[in-house]
Amino acid sequence: MPRFGAHMSISGGVSKSFARGESVGLDAMQIFAKNERQWTAKPISAEEMAAFQAEQQRTGIHPVIVHDSYLINLAAPADDLREKSIVAFADELERCAQLKIPYLVTHPGAHTGIGEEAGLVRVADAISRLLAEGVGGTTMILLETTAGQGTALGYRFEHLARLFELIPYHDRLGVCVDTCHIFAAGYDIRDPDTYDATFAELDRLVGLERVKCFHLNDSQKDLGSRVDRHAHIGQGCIGTEAFRLLVNDPRFAHLPMIIETPKGEDMAEDRMNLALLRSLVRITAA
């Protein structure tokens, strides 16, 4: 069975996320390693690192995945913004290493007018520079599929394939597939035929072995809308059948599958979405 999880708040410190995750029954978890809307943050203290490890051991929640700051744009044509983004991304990687977090999810960025190829080259150069320096230890960078809003990169599987061509450090590079994003980008997964075709295309261009994580989100907007609006599982334009296919796909049977669906402070919606996903899993004899 996949390891189902959700994105949890780090209010009060990164270690506090585990109690929240435990309260909604998470197997896996995604967090921000710092305030996602600020460029800088104070270092993680030794005490907080120890508390994080202790809470992870206590709860058994794993893996923990970090999503980087929304401010970071490694494709930015403006050198000052790009350099600021590279410094911030390096800090994200180092925080992951300090917390022994295996995966850092990032959107490939937005080219803001210089063109997709030029943007991809800038992203690849930035990531290659950091990985060449060994920043982040063994933490793997997961390139997330995007919906393709504006000039965002990563909405075509070809973009991911190009980044793997340009970045030589494949042991530190993987993929996170967001169901809402690929659907909004034009990849249909609503029935067995379209599901198989979409993942065959991803396998051909990138390789399914490079997929390390899923974001499970339904979509408020229709196929090919290029608009990123998450919906509760089964309540959007994708529908339940796609998620039934995904959670029972043996190729992804042990991967973390993280929901990023709308929720309030009591996280009741997380419990609802996770219960639905688990109910879709067919139990087979070992």
UniProtKB/Swiss-Prot annotation:
It catalyses: Endonucleolytic cleavage to 5'-phosphooligonucleotide end-products. The keyword Coiled coil does not apply. One of its GO terms (molecular function) is zinc ion binding. Zn(2+) 3 binds at residues 181, 228, 230. PANTHER family: APURINIC-APYRIMIDINIC ENDONUCLEASE, ENDONUCLEASE IV ENDODEOXYRIBONUCLEASE IV. SUPFAM superfamilies: Xylose isomerase-like. Belongs to the AP endonuclease 2 family. Its cofactor is Zn(2+). It is an enzyme of class 3 (hydrolase). The keyword Cytoplasm does not apply. SMART domains: AP2Ec (SM00518). Its EC number is 3.1.21.2. Binds 3 Zn(2+) ions. Keywords: DNA damage, DNA repair, Endonuclease, Hydrolase, Metal-binding, Nuclease, Zinc. This is Probable endonuclease 4. HAMAP family: Nfo. GO terms for biological process: base-excision repair. Pfam families: AP_endonuc_2. InterPro entries: AP_endonuc_2, AP_endonuc_F2_Zn_BS, Xyl_isomerase-like_sf, Xyl_isomerase-like_TIM-brl. Endonuclease IV plays a role in DNA repair. It cleaves phosphodiester bonds at apurinic or apyrimidinic (AP) sites, generating a 3'-hydroxyl group and a 5'-terminal sugar phosphate. The gene is nfo. Zn(2+) 2 binds at residues 144, 178, 215, 260. Zn(2+) 1 binds at residues 67, 107, 144. It comes from Chloroflexus aggregans (strain MD-66 / DSM 9485).
